[in-house]
UniProtKB/Swiss-Prot annotation:
GO terms for cellular component: Golgi apparatus; membrane. This is Probable sugar phosphate/phosphate translocator At3g17430. Belongs to the TPT transporter family. TPT (TC 2.A.7.9) subfamily. The keyword Transmembrane helix applies. It is a multi-pass membrane protein. It is found in: Membrane. It holds the Pfam family TPT. Keywords: Membrane, Sugar transport, Transmembrane, Transmembrane helix, Transport. Residues 328-348 are annotated as: Disordered.
């Protein structure tokens, strides 16, 4: 029994570590590539299109050429009414989020991302997937106050960058709500590869119009450096992040992944001040962010409590570990790309770059059931 527990814990910590490294790495890498002070590729839409094109190409190879994953049954109606709107808001959230790197620091961006639960709750109420509640509203108010305090303490506050980031947050929140409303309504489940196969190309097309208007003229008149290996490794990291999130979802519970997400944010804030010396954190920044995080933690606690109350009694710890061990033994600890991912219920979590259907810190789902769900 002790061996089984240790094996499960070690694997869990390894997956969490991979997730934290990749998630932080993609954000810092994007900042480095886009920043005029470093690699100097100030074209966020172009960078996002490279990510989407690469992800779609890899997904196409895995599904159509190497037959690693079986394609899902996709009708024109589902594609037009579900995939297209989700892709539109996904593309918007990445576009606005990456553009924010040109104007504000990574540390301040992470602090603003604490608004994600507020944005998602508002969108969920507007779309009718959630109901206004006093306890949740008080937490949202606490988060908002914390972000305002943190913004007030920002030395290099930039209104343009802040607007871009907040707009991206609300676009991502609407994308999460649409994912729940549209895909769950159609009974469609997608694994990480099939989600990229359908959503990445569509997002690429949506980004083409603003790219043609805003960035193509700039590329024609200015000397933009293009290093193949830089962009290839950047896109590869973004793609790997998708799979790491999938592995973390399968190995950990909702509470664990939330704690990992909060830890990642603090690590990212600290790392960004070291890697990018121009990023300055004030006491007011930290105070405001701490207040906002208190609201986020309380909100997550309420959501987990609600889910536990609505679910049947969970298995005892020994039984659960035994089941996990049997599942691990059966799969020989190999990743099965045909496993589908249950679309999480919306709850307001910070998104990670390039994760079209899976949130980085799940709102309030339990353990995702892997292995026996057909893609």
């Amino acid at each position: 029994m002790a061996k089984m527990i240790n094996k499960t814990l070690v694997l869990t910590y390894i997956y969490l570590l991979i997730y934290i490294i990749l998630s932080s790495g993609v954000i810092l890498y994007n900042k480095w590539v886009l920043s005029p002070k470093y690699f100097n590729f100030p074209l966020p839409i172009t960078l996002t299109m490279i990510h989407m094109g690469f992800a779609g190409f890899v997904a196409f190879l895995l599904i159509r050429v190497f037959k690693v994953v079986a394609p899902v049954k996709m009708t024109f109606e589902i594609y037009a009414t579900c995939v297209v709107p989700i892709s539109a808001f996904f593309a918007s959230s990445l576009w606005f989020g990456n553009t924010a790197y040109l104007h504000i620091s990574v540390a301040f961006i992470q602090m603003l991302k604490a608004l994600m639960p507020v944005a998602t709750f508002i969108m969920a109420v507007v779309c009718g997937t959630d109901k206004p509640r006093c306890d949740v509203f008080s937490n949202m108010l606490l988060v908002s106050v914390g972000v305002v305090i943190s913004s007030y303490g920002e030395i290099h506050f930039n209104i343009v960058g802040t607007v871009y980031q907040v707009t991206g947050i609300f676009a991502e929140a609407l994308r999460l709500v649409l994912t729940q409303v549209l895909l769950q309504k159609k009974g469609l489940t997608l694994n990480p590869i099939t989600s990229l196969y359908y959503i990445a190309p569509c997002s690429f097309v949506f980004l083409a119009l603003p790219w043609y208007v805003l960035e193509k003229p700039t590329m024609e008149v200015s000397q933009i450096q293009f290093n193949f290996w830089i962009f290839f490794s950047n896109a590869l990291c973004a793609l790997a992040l998708n799979f790491s999130i999938f592995l973390v979802i399968g190995r950990t519970g909702a509470v664990t992944i939330r704690v990992a997400g909060v830890l990642k944010d603090w690590i990212l804030i600290a790392l960004s001040t070291v890697i990018f010396p121009e990023s300055t954190i004030t006491g007011l920044n930290i105070t405001g962010y701490a207040i906002a995080l208190c609201g986020v933690v309380m909100y997550n606690y309420i959501k987990v409590r609600d889910v536990k109350a609505s679910q049947p009694t969970a298995d005892s710890l020994p039984d659960r570990i035994n089941k996990e061990y049997k599942m691990e033994k059966k799969s020989s600890d190999k990743f099965n790309p045909n496993d589908s991912v249950e679309i999480p219920r919306v709850g307001g979590e910070v998104n990670d770059e390039e994760a079209p259907l899976i949130t980085s810190r799940l709102s309030h789902i339990g353990r995702t059931q892997l292995g026996n769900h057909a893609a």
